[in-house]
């Protein structure tokens, strides 16, 4: 599996300079300016705020119900009995049974687990070749080998249940249908094949289902720990994939790229690596569940060479260089996220175990309406939610102690904010230009409001912050509706 976060370790000083210039130009182009590095307590120069129109809060996007797809994979073959062994042709060996063909007339075929008291362990090459009327087939989980072209010409196939494994020397699904390369696989797998339930195995190989354009609903086995690079690339009809019940640890680069119909992706908490562009081109994605934001965790194993580069200052840890949502959608830098994130994305849920939301994590993720954070997150990084235009409310878990500079800067539709009981540190310009923000509740542990913290919050009417003893410059600049607080 190709693991591109490590490529970040090869960035030299020239590339770093280019990215710094890109960031500077991007910030200059924005309608307001995030805070520069400033020593806390210094007097900040006056910030001139432009006239900002409060946006229409209406958002009529509604998540699509995927229950039909879930039911389809869960109930597949549930009431269909196995065919009689007398209708199958097969060979019996000392180790098991190899099915070589079928002579019956069933259009929905469930192969039995055992024949003559021995497990069915293999499907021979060409075993069901040319069965153009076959609608569905279930291969028992005891099977460890399926020969090439076993289902070639099964052009009416709509549903299939089969173990995860590959033909010898052909690690791609299309080989079962006569393809001789993964690139050609999509042309051999029947477009009619829409439902696939995979069983057994621990790896979905690289390019395994490359361009299988008819697949709509797929269930991943509860034993799989790795999904390879480009595994479901260009599966343009893939709408639903059941994956959150697995012990998955790694998803390769562009594993689901080009899955233009995919509605949601819910990964398990066990994942420690997510490849570059994993969801690039998933233009209809509405919700996602991830264990962290970025390409990998800080405990992701590095080579000695990579460790030396980090210690020598020639590189940063890939968990830091990839710690933004746009990385998963193909953006090479966090400032490019807006051009890659699907406009359909409404909800992001971060799973328990995540301890921090990195700087720039959701930078200009303008379409997102809701981000669910788990108890255990301790810090919201700098610019973490900068420019999240459709974020309407935020309630932090009690574990959060710090909010970085510009963390919610420019969240123009956010109306309410509530800090958890553990919050004590607010960054400068943390809520600047949140023009729709009406109500803010901060715990008594917050004792200082830093420079420009609420500047430009035109709608702010209620601020509950009884622990505040000091405040910086221009904290409430243009907060004309707020009463009881001094500029």
Where do the model's predicted regions map?
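N-terminal Lys/Arg-rich, disordered targeting/topogenic segments
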Residues: 1-3
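Sec-dependent N-terminal signal peptides
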Residues: 7-22
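C-terminal motif of bacterial Sec signal peptides marking the signal peptidase cleavage site
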Residues: 26-29
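Solvent-exposed loop and capping/linker segments of extracellular ligand-binding repeat ectodomains
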Residues: 31-37, 41-487
């Amino acid at each position: 599996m190709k693991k591109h976060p490590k490529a970040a370790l090869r960035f030299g000083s020239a590339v770093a300079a280019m990215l710094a210039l890109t960031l500077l130009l991007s910030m200059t182009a924005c309608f307001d300016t995030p805070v520069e590095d400033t020593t806390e307590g210094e007097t900040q120069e006056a910030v001139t705020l432009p006239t900002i129109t409060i946006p229409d809060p209406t958002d009529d996007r509604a998540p699509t119900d995927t229950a039909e797809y879930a039911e389809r994979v869960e109930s597949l073959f549930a009431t269909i009995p196995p065919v009689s062994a007398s209708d199958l042709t097969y060979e019996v060996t000392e180790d098991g049974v190899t099915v070589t063909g079928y002579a019956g007339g069933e259009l929905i075929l469930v192969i039995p687990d055992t024949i003559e008291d021995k497990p069915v362990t293999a499907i021979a090459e060409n075993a069901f070749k040319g069965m153009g009327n076959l609608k569905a087939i279930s291969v028992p989980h005891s099977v460890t080998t399926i020969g090439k072209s076993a289902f070639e010409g099964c052009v009416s196939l709509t549903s299939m249940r089969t173990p995860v494994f590959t033909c010898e020397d052909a690690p791609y699904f299309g080989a079962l249908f006569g393809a001789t390369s993964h690139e050609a696989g999509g042309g051999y797998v029947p477009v009619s094949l829409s439902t696939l339930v995979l069983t057994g195995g621990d790896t979905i190989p690289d390019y395994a289902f490359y361009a299988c354009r008819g697949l709509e609903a797929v269930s991943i086995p509860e034993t799989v720990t790795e999904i390879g690079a480009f595994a479901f690339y260009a599966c343009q009809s893939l709408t639903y994939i059941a994956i959150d019940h697995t012990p998955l640890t790694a998803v390769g680069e562009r594993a689901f790229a080009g899955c233009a119909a995919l509605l949601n992706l819910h990964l398990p908490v066990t994942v420690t690596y997510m490849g570059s562009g994993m969801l690039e081109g998933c233009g209809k994605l509405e919700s996602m569940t991830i264990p962290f934001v970025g390409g990998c965790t800080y405990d992701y194993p590095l080579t000695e060479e990579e460790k030396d580069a980090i210690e020598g200052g020639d590189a940063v840890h890939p968990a830091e260089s990839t710690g933004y949502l746009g990385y998963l959608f193909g953006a090479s830098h966090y400032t490019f996220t807006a051009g890659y994130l699907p406009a359909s994305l409404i909800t992001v849920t971060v799973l328990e175990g995540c301890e921090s939301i990195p700087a720039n994590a959701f930078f200009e993720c303008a379409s997102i309406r809701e981000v669910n954070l788990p108890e255990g997150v301790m810090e919201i990084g700098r610019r973490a939610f900068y420019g999240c235009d459709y974020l309407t409310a935020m309630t932090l878990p009690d574990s959060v102690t710090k909010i970085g500079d510009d963390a919610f800067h420019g969240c123009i539709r956010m109306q309410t904010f509530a800090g958890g009981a553990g919050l004590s540190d607010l960054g400068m310009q943390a809520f600047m230009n949140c023009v729709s923000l009406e109500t803010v509740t901060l715990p008594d542990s917050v004792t200082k409001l830093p420079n420009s913290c609420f500047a430009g919050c035109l709608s702010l009417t209620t601020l509950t912050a009884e622990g505040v003893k000091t405040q910086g410059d221009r904290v409430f600049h243009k907060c004309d509706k707020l009463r009881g607080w001094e500029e």
